[in-house]
Amino acid sequence: MLLAALCCLLWSFRTSTGHFPRACASSKSLMEKECCPPWSGDGSPCGQLSGRGACQDIILSNAPFGPQFPFTGVDDRESWPSVFYNRTCQCFGNFMGFNCGNCKFGFWGQNCTEKRLLVRKNIFDLSVPEKNKFLAYLTLAKHTTSPDYVIPTGTYGQMNNGSTPMFNDINIYDLFVWMHYYVSRDTLLGGSEIWKDIDFAHEAPGFLPWHRLFLLLWEQEIQKLTGDENFTIPYWDWRDAKSCDICTDEYMGGRNPANPNLLSPASFFSSWQIVCTRLEEYNSRQALCDGTPEGPLLRNPGNHDKARTPRLPSSADVEFCLSLTQYESDSMDKAANFSFRNTLEGFASPLTGIADASQSSMHNALHIYMNGTMSQVPGSANDPIFLLHHAFVDSIFEQWLRRHHPLREVYPEANAPIGHNRESYMVPFIPLYRNGDLFISSRDLGYDYSNLQESERDIFQDYIKPYLEQASRIWPWLIGAAVVGCVVTAVLGGLTSLLCRRNRKQLHEEKQPLLMEKEDYHSLLYQTHL
């Protein structure tokens, strides 16, 4: 019933977040390299007449990259998005979006002047209606074609430099699956040649900012799709977990009793079709994923390679990560030592901070543990557990930011792997965002985590508690001292008052005349005689 009601609402809302805007997928836009669609509010490009933004040239950073990618001009993702567009909407103030029709994260209202903070909750703290609504929203997104975005099915060269556009429609959920595939796919070098050592969202500094933006845009898309502006992605706190406690039909899908690699037929997700998982096939054809369904969602949690991932992360592992003071270090890739990012991502040991190619820990451990669709990087976002998992990873990132208060300059400006420098635009997002733009507190982006709000209260209580205990121990002495002080003050006050009166009396007598007036003198004589 809830799903049907949501479907009825669908066309009342327009989405505006993602990859290639439908309005910019024409041969004219591609050949002119301009993506500045009109805003529906006034019909002008980028809402310029209303002061929302303007169509401007894209300024690219010229900071050098690391040595991991030795090519130039062979991948559409290089110097993003310059292969496709060199002019896009640059929005003003609190406006955002490919046509400046949205508000920046954390701002709301017709003119984007209202600021508010949304809270992401632990999935196990959701009420039954909240949990069911979340599952229904996922299903709705899976069955709704994106009205504003399309995906390219060929490279810019295969499109004859834009003169022959190659784009497909895709549903809203799979749009984000496709984004995760596209950002992490191999480079197609022509013929049968490929280059695997490249990833614009993993194994380098941009890992955490990229996935932070991915979740924010996904969250915003669901808010617009459903009209539920208070919607937030729940997180799964997997610390110290002994098994996949969200892998039940009540939550993210139990195990199929007939085939342990499939989901239970009672699950919302057992009928889902996955996309963008056949990387070797795409590479052999020098092609891109086109969004064609590729079979059911696979998951077999716990039956993974235990030599590589002996256990799920512990609370101590998380605390060790948070204790690391360097965001990035050394080569700034998966070989980096004592790097918070590399340790949290799972390429360095959460016991020592030393990179270990034989182990997959922390974030990576959860992907390996799921032993299915989620275990291969490009197509891992097919599994909705991906969202819950990365929301918790983002909460750890947020804890680190609050604990160490790094400046934006802490994020590497140069020499990171391609696409990961501070001023590099993140692939494949339009509108454009730099890696450094997301290296800020979540509260500045309009959201928080329920566990962090609680921990901050606990920190305050832990700070003030020793002083309260000391006060409680000396409280009787303080009361006694106060009483004694009052008594002493009263006595001293009384003595002081008495002395003052005596002094005034003596002073009065001293001021009497030594000789009386004549009349007084005679009167005194009269009295004496009597």
Curated annotation (Swiss-Prot):
Record EC number: 1.14.18.1
Subcellular location: Melanosome membrane; Melanosome
Membrane topology summary: Single-pass type I membrane protein
Transmembrane segments: 474-494
Stored SUPFAM superfamilies: Di-copper centre-containing domain (SSF48056)
Topological domain ranges for the Cytoplasmic compartment: 495-530
Reactions catalysed according to its record: 2 L-dopa + O2 = 2 L-dopaquinone + 2 H2O; L-tyrosine + O2 = L-dopaquinone + H2O; 2 5,6-dihydroxyindole-2-carboxylate + O2 = 2 indole-5,6-quinone-2-carboxylate + 2 H2O
Keywords: Copper, Glycoprotein, Melanin biosynthesis, Membrane, Metal-binding, Monooxygenase, Oxidoreductase, Signal, Transmembrane, Transmembrane helix
Post-translational events: Glycosylated.
Residues annotated for Cu cation A binding in this entry: 180, 202, 211
Binding site for Cu cation B: 363, 367, 390
InterPro entries reported for this sequence: Di-copper_centre_dom_sf (IPR008922), Tyrosinase/Hemocyanin (IPR050316), Tyrosinase_Cu-bd (IPR002227)
Names of required cofactors: Cu(2+)
Leading EC class: oxidoreductase
Keyword Iron (UniProt): no
Pfam families tied to this protein: Tyrosinase
First and last residue of the signal peptide: 1-18
PANTHER family (UniProt xref): TYROSINASE, TYROSINASE FAMILY MEMBER
Subunit structure, as described in the record: Forms an OPN3-dependent complex with DCT in response to blue light in melanocytes.
Stated name of the protein: Tyrosinase
